Amino acid sequence: MKKIWLALAGMVLAFSASAAQISDGKQYITLDKPVAGEPQVLEFFSFYCPHCYQFEEVLHVSDNVKKKLPEGTKMTKYHVEFLGPLGKELTQAWAVAMALGVEDKVTVPLFEAVQKTQTVQSAADIRKVFVDAGVKGEDYDAAWNSFVVKSLVAQQEKAAADLQLQGVPAMFVNGKYQINPQGMDTSSMDVFVQQYADTVKYLVDKK
């Protein structure tokens, strides 16, 4: 029993030490110009970005962050248009995914079609990925030029500009803080992901 307790105490101490070590300029950066009105937790990515693919498919960073967030905390993902020949079209397609609520259905297929099989070479190819993932073609077409999708595209572009986004993947909290992966412990993938998620939670609680 004593051994179990000591092990548990060690875990608590390790967690406390980890939380205490989160600091401005290391695991996160306070923005010089905070941006009001941004989603609580905002992640920027591109289907063309190899590191974004790693974050999503290998490290599962987004999933781990979501698990740590307090109940009711909204996490939003925006696509950027400044990477790749179909950056604009993929940003619009991501807006379609948000409008139809099919982000989880199309994320992995789009990453794989853009980076792995390289079968996305046109707007029609993007549409095919959606259809193959179970989205009705008519629903996709109706959403593509809709007011809602146009607004979501503008929203993504404005957020990237307002936050002076330099590259992806990138995550911001409350429009005030940017996560700094370069300051994370990279001794193992699990430790890195855990610290990343802990840092986001710390900043959400900090407000």
Swiss-Prot record:
Residues 20-158 form the Thioredoxin domain. Keywords: Disulfide bond, Periplasm, Redox-active center, Signal. It comes from the Bacteria. The keyword Signal applies. Residues 1-19 form the signal peptide. GO terms for cellular component: outer membrane-bounded periplasmic space. One of its GO terms (molecular function) is protein disulfide isomerase activity. GO terms for biological process: cellular response to antibiotic. Disulfide bonds join C49-C52. It is found in: Periplasm. Pfam families: DSBA. InterPro entries: DSBA-like_thioredoxin_dom, DsbA/DsbL, Thiol_disulfide_DsbA, Thioredoxin-like_sf, Thioredoxin_CS, Thioredoxin_domain. Required for disulfide bond formation in some periplasmic proteins such as PhoA or OmpA. Acts by transferring its disulfide bond to other proteins and is reduced in the process. DsbA is reoxidized by DsbB. It is required for pilus biogenesis. Belongs to the thioredoxin family. DsbA subfamily. This is Thiol:disulfide interchange protein DsbA. It comes from Salmonella typhimurium (strain LT2 / SGSC1412 / ATCC 700720). The lineage of its organism: Bacteria, Pseudomonadati, Pseudomonadota, Gammaproteobacteria, Enterobacterales.
